[in-house]
Amino acid sequence: MGTPARCTAGRVNVALVCGGRWHDFDYARLQILQLLGRHDSVRCSIHQDFSDVAALAAADAVIAYTCDVRPGREEALALRDRVRAGGRLLALHATNSAIDAPVPGAERVYRTPDAMPEFSALLGNRFLAHPRITPMRIEMVKPEHPLVSGIPAFVTTDEIYVSELADDLEVIMDAPYDGPCPGFATQQVPGRTRHPVLFSRPEGSGSVVSFTLGHCRGRFDVADQGMDDLGVTDTAAWESPEFRAVLRRCVDWAVHGDDVERCYPGDEYSKELQ
């Protein structure tokens, strides 16, 4: 006997871009695919970067979890045009980053050049730095927003991003922090003591949602920095039930936009924090 469809909408084409540097992309990819798998309307293609312009332009939604993956002008503008035509872009964690690692023998400072201006403009933000990974309090700026409704403020051990921000962002969650970011060329943004971690912006008929929490790192992910085996994996951020609840809602939004009620992906949607 077949299983009745959970999604009343038709087929939704999703392109998942997951790859880059210094993170456990296998872990992140699996977690995101499991969330997408709750939707029987989804057909998903997998990519490591933004170079397959045709596939991304054909997708109803693009979900990206990358670090130091730098879309060129053609790639960024094609993605922008898709969003403007009603597409959805979910940018997770370090997707907003272009990072130049320290040169061997030089001062150990990471620099974050403005290397992908068209893509940064689409996202509405550009990574500059983050403080050391430590427990941080995450607060709701718009507690009534569907992506966070019913989820309380929480503490998580994660990277809090200090970023250059556009003026048209709707900030949904942020984190208070006014200290330095050791190891980065840009250590602070003068006058800013709160840093958005979940926010959105319109682009034509479509939308972009950015959720910058969600660091993860495997044993062998910083070998290029002289540490062949860290001996441990770091998925602490993903162990937060509040983080998982927000991520689940973000993925649901990517699949069905604001009309997520057309899909009934399982009991866990209403029991996120249990």
Language model features: what each stretch is:
Residues G2-R11, R38, V189-H195, E203-Q274:
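Extracellular ligand-binding/catalytic regions of CAZymes and related secreted enzymes
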Residues P4, G37, R43, A57-A58, ...:
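Catalytic beta-strand/loop cores that center a nucleophilic Ser/Cys/Thr
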Residues T8, N13-A101:
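Helical hinge/lid and interdomain linker segments adjacent to catalytic or ligand-binding clefts
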Residues V17-G20, A64, V162, F199-E203, ...:
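Extended, composition-driven regions rather than compact fold-specific motifs
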Residues Y27-R29, A94, A101-G105, F184-A185, ...:
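Short aromatic-enriched loop/helix-cap "lid" or pocket-rim segments at secondary-structure transitions
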Residues A28, E75, A115, F243-L247:
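Stable alpha-helical elements in mature extracytoplasmic
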Residues R70-G150:
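A glycine-rich, often tryptophan-bearing local segment used as a flexible ligand/cofactor-contacting loop or short
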